[in-house]
């Protein structure tokens, strides 16, 4: 199942939590949305064993209140110490129970579900759930993960090659991303693909990224800016003819090689078409 925000709102997240029966593992960059916190609180009252793990120092943010509110739910709570270093983050956005996993682009705050373009994907694939469970348990316990990763998952550190394979797939690709950044392998792949690439970024993009835009435009990459008052592009997606990517990864060196990030590759034609249609609608609203 694919959910598109802000249209879908917070309901899919709350529903996922409400459906948990025995346990629920949540790993997000930060969590402050009240309906989600309330759903967690009710899940614990039902007897669900809830574990929540967040980043310890999200960029330009204090988590003092966030930590307090999460602990008040009664959930088991940890800062991801494996990625609690300078300029390194636990930027993942996923949760899972014993039979379902949700992977997406949204931080669990009010803006994600009311103002942002975000995508969330749910799956019942047992192998994907098993991989995510092992990753979560390792990070939660502060142990380096060295296990098997399902081939449909895009997990950082070490996600560069899978992102390059998304860019290099035959045919045109459509990208929505909050930022670009100077990471030569990604920029070279985009430049090489040239006019077969369309990219939507928020109009509030940094001056540094504006230089990257000018570089890519020299290679005929088509780039448009989405006015922030319309919808804020926080999503990270790559949509092609054969497959699509949704995940937490930005296309930067740190995101792909240092952070904990989680994404998913989708091969379902119906969902790919849904993503394409949303991109085309967004493209028409850009400048």
Describe the function of each predicted region.
Residues 40, 187-190:
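Class I S-adenosylmethionine-dependent transferase superfamily signal
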